[in-house]
Amino acid sequence: MRLNSIKLSGFKSFAEPTNFMLPGQLVGVVGPNGCGKSNIMDAVRWVLGESKASELRGESMQDVIFNGTTHRKPASRSSVELVFDNSDHRAGGQWGQFGEIAVKRVLTREGNSSYFINNQAVRRRDVQDVFLGTGLGPRAYAIIGQGTISRIIESRPEELRLFLEEAAGVSKYKERRRETENRLSATTENLTRVEDILRELNNNLDRLEKQAEVAAQYNALQSQVTLKQQQLWFLKRAEAEAEQDRVRVEGLQAVNELEERMADIRNNESGLETLRQAHYDASDQVNQAQAKLYESTAEVGKLEAEIRYVLEGRQRVQQRLQQLSEQVLLWNSRREEAEAEIENLEGAGMDAEEQAEMLAAQVEEQSMRLPDLEDALRNAQKADTDQRASVVQVQQQIQVLAAEQRSLDEQRRQFETRFERLRADRNALETPDEARLNNLQSQLQEARELAEMADAVLNELQDSVPQLDEDRRTRQQAVNAEAARHADLSARLEALKALQEKVKTDGKLQPWLAKHGLDGMQGLWSRIAIEPGWENALEAALRERLGALEVGRLDMVRGFLGSGGHDAPPARLAFFSPPQGAPAPAAGRWQHLSDLLRVNDAGLRAVLGDWLQDCYTAPTLEEALSRRSELRPGETVYVPTGHAVSSHSVSFYAQDSEQSGLLARAQEIEHLEKEVRAQALISDESRTALVRAESAYAEASQRLVSARREASESQSRAHELQVETLRLSQLAEQARARNAQISADLAEVEAQLSDIEERRVAAEARFEELDMQLADSQERHAQLGDKVLESERRLNESREQLRTLERQAQEATFSRRSLEARRGELSRTIETASQQARSLADEQQRAQDELTRLTDAAAQGGLQDALDLKMQREQAVAARRSEYDDLTNKLRASDERRQQLEKALDPLRQRITEFQLKEQAARLGLEQYSTLLEEAGADLAAVSQSIAEANVRMHGLQGEIDRLHREIAALGAVNLAALDELKLARERKTFLDAQTEDLTQAMNTLEDAIRKIDAETRELLSGTFETVNGHFGRMFPELFGGGQAKLVITGDEILDSGVQVIAQPPGKKNQTIHLLSGGEKALTAIALVFAIFQLNPAPFCLLDEVDAPLDDANTERYAKLVASMSKSTQFLFISHNKIAMEMAQQLIGVTMQEQGVSRIVAVDMESALSMAELS
């Protein structure tokens, strides 16, 4: 194990990062005084765990941080790192498996000090454990600073023994013995406490057994009381439930009867409504039959007129045949008569029409009034029904109020009785003396507070340790996950690189390229990059040119084809020669595909600009298609997927060659390489966090063990005081509880009495209010009943007037239609007369034909049918009127029955109200006893079974309960917790007995371990002493050129005795080394240190100007000895002596050209010697 390098940053005068490389076995550090050479020694001591500022030549640990100069700011942190070659695996612990170990310490201005081994955060103790037994440490014999040589030789014997122990490697044994002694001390203390607790616990067991016997009697009696009370409540609950069921059944019967009667009323109302509808339908049928009768009457009149017309026509024809002149006169006379009659008919027709319109308006008006009257009737009926319900509601409220008043009177009597009994109990209550009890309770409170504080600390640690463990596990998982992700990214990267290499080396072109010596050239794709997402577009545009090769001149590619062009490449291949400059970018309507390229080579950009001159981009295929009309001939638009659109075509891209995907893979490889590097950093940070989490978890676990011990001790003390206090506190507590309970009961009873009185007064006032409200409601109900009868009368009169008006309107309409028919007949007569007058010349022949043609047979037959139909319709009208009258009588009778049924509902509703009140009272009783049973946590099935098995009756149960209460009172004060305390005490005694046995066994084991460690340490230290003493006796004359020296044990026991140095240079018989000169002391110390090295050579040794007190002759002997020992130990020494410099295999110069800042410089031997002479 050797030191490879020392890295300093911000440590003392080394403001900048400085790396001391130590390749040889003898490395000398030279430089003028005050340049910072000794800071190197301080740095090594500091990183190995030195925590005392004075040992580092400072007042505080902050002094090791560079504090700035006139031209430099102070550093924010100090860092020192030692890099060791551990190829021989000499380092101990888990780090021994590493071939190289880097130990690092970092200190910030905030005072945060951190240690790292191989970039993993560790504790200071972990750093020291690595070098246990190697002679390395903050104050080990392998680091000899200025003045340390003299301090070693002048150390007290006990201090000098430490160097011997370090050389013997017993540091780990001493650490084990110290830990074992700590455990033995803790075990002894625990055993003493357990024995004290056992003595106290045995004293308490007898008293607890007596108290537990009384508590068992109390529990048995209390169980009987609970059972009897639950049986009483159960029986009362069953009685209330039976009463509720009985009242509910009777109430349901009354409700069913009410519903039956209500169903009768609804059926009656339904029939009444049906009769009303039938009444309306019958009225409509009468009107329809009357209308049909009017139509038949008009038809008979029409047929009679036709018959008359035929007879008159025949007579007229005959008269015409006899005398034309008489016919003309006759027709003229008839025309005049018809015209006169038309004039008369016009006046009658206008009167008839006015009468019909007036009657129609009256019918419409009367019809519009009818709904208002029906609404008024319904509103009156609704108000009457609502008022009737209000009357019933008020009556029910009066009945409920009366029952409530009776209940309040009964409650008041009960509470007054209870009030008197409680006052008597309080007067008879005695209050015990509590002076001593208060003192004990104060002590108990203090003990409990201490126990709570210990529990709080324990709980906090119990909460934090799992969290820290979870954090440790989480960070371990994070380390695994980050490592897996790093491996995954690395695998993906290697796969892509392999695929890329395979594409480059495989294929048909590769042999041809190798043949012409072109296989080592890079394709175009490896020299360009494009914005992410546009790789396919660029491949689609360039195709085989993406793999183009660069040549100096394009003329030289003809030589690749061979003579006659028979050696052409087996696949498409492009060459390019970049020009000297790049063309200026051209502005356009579209974005050029070349604008997306990332190419630094101007010539290469010019080539690509030429190839992609007419290539543009569009974000989507839809946009490219929509704007293709803007393209000029030869221009093409590419979308990210590689599809191409020109002004008259669309080409879809697909990977169809061995060069496809080269550019995308190249960019992905570049991205993955960045991710792999970033992931490596993340993995390192995760491992560092894991080390910190494991350290925090281990520290918290140790604190948890101590906290558990302290919590156990506090709980034991509190338990002892609680047991002592319990006996005294029970009587006082029971007296206070009883007094408080009586006071609370009295206050409650007074409040209940006051509340009952207020409720009783309010009930009386409410009763009077409801009485007056009932009288008002009944009066209002009577008024509303009269209003309903008046509305029904007005509605019936309105309906009768409507039917009369409808009949008159139908008659007026029939009269108007008859006049219109007569007027039409007269108009035809006038027309006929006019025609006859105009055609007298040929009338004779036509008259003869008409005489033959005219006949009344058809009219006579139609007349008889019309008369029969008229008679039938007259009978139908009479039948409809008879039905209408019958329905009117039935409607009146049905309405009277409805009113009778409604009056019969009031007594039945009153009975239902009474049943509801009874059921409510039974339900309240049921709920009361159910609540009591539920609050008592009673098992209803078990209570019911106990009642059935013992044939329990309600009578006498209360007396039995009172008797049990008296027996309980006779027991006096009872410690109810005695049973649990006795059980806990016995369990605790069993546990403490086992713990005593375990602790005794542990003490024996620890004492045996200490004896074994002492024996091993004594044997190892004795052997080391003899060996070192021999080496010391041999090296002393070698350094002094004679004389003698030895080590002497100052006591009988080597484990605790000191070591004294006896040294006598040549010619001297001194009895103590304090009589030696400084140079002699230095040589003696060097001899002792080197003697220790002979036994257990440290990996390296640091010597800070130890040759300063020596003359040249002693220095030469010192240098020779160091040179011989460098075969097994690496030496780093600081010296101003040219003799010492000559033995160095490597020289490191330290200078301070900038005031206050140390730097290293290369030094040759001549410069070093001259520097030594100048110093």
Swiss-Prot record:
**One MF term in GO for this entry?**
ATP hydrolysis activity
Bilayer-crossing residues are none
Q: One GO CC term of this entry?
A: chromosome
Could you tell me the keywords of this UniProt record? ATP-binding, Coiled coil, Cytoplasm, DNA-binding, Nucleotide-binding
The alphabetized list of GO BP terms reads: chromosome condensation; chromosome segregation; DNA replication; sister chromatid cohesion
Where do the record's region annotations for Disordered lie?
807-849
Q: Where in the cell is it found?
A: Cytoplasm
Q: Any S-S bridges, and between which cysteines?
A: none
Which residues participate in ATP binding?
P32, N33, G34, C35, G36, K37, S38, N39
Record-linked NCBIfam families: SMC_prok_B
Family, according to the entry, reads as follows:
Belongs to the SMC family.
Assembly and partners are described as:
Homodimer.
Which protein are we looking at?
Answer: Chromosome partition protein Smc
